[in-house]
Amino acid sequence: MFIVDSYALAVVFCFVTMLCWGSWGNTQKMAAKTWRYELFYWDYVIGMFLFALILSLTMGSFGSEGRPFLQDLGQASGANIASALLGGVIFNASNILLSASTALAGMAVAFPLGVGLALVLGVIINYAGAPKGDPVILFVGVALIVAAIVCNGIASGRMQKGAGGNSNSRKGIVLAMVAGVLMSFFYRFVAAAMDLDHFENLTAGMLTPYSALFILSAGVLLSNFVFNTYVMKRPFVGAPVSYREYFTGSGTTHLVGMLGGAVWCLGTAFSYIAAGKAGAAISYALGQGAPMVAAVWGVFVWKEFRGAGRSVGWLLAVMFLFFILGLACIILSGGN
């Protein structure tokens, strides 16, 4: 299997993760004009599962180091498979809420609040499980991310006040916060199933990053029959959606959703592959710089803060500054 052999390359992989995790939401925005997010989400999950399988059979199967994908699956212990599956179930619950929040409140609000909160809690959880890097610099970086989240929250609040507010936006903010709390836990369950210290000569019973990703995506797909079916019948906003409507979508519409799942899956694969050199906490934290990427898309491409006053513009500028400084601290923490 392919293995990252240097911290510098691990950081590059983490930046790719950040771009992927912060950009997949664009596919939802592209499909949202004619396609309910509950239907989009099925394509997203299918794309994620298929791309995880492709990565596992290619990058996860070639090379002289580590264990190839199929051999690794055959020797994995039940406890580690269950841990990765549980990570997929937790992620799916959080991501459905995040997708709903994006549909209600926009990318520039949902991602910084939801994923930013997941970053803070997730770094603490992952560092406690596998300490690596300078904790002082790491948590200074996390504190700066918290400051960025606060700026985003104030900016979105002023936007609502200026526009008279609406119940959908408020509901979207609440959903983003709940999603963030749930999302902070999924990575640890998957990381616990992997041998992060010995990718070249893995411990028996533990998983490679590729096998862990495949099992995670299987957990997402299986749990989607429960979670998304429930949301389709009892949506957060709008009328209930039927499975019959899913099959009325065009091929292009379905492919856009699958692309979103593939983009997220690529980012997650790179995060797990990088964790061997960077450590779970740092790999997770760098990837969760995604809110800044999503906010850039939301502010500059989708114009979600169009018409905002000068004070909102300053808050957004400070938010971006704090995110950049926070990410810099997280990178530095791994070199100490």
Report each predicted region and the residues it spans.
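Polytopic alpha-helical membrane proteins, predominantly small-molecule transporters/carriers
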Residues: 1-336
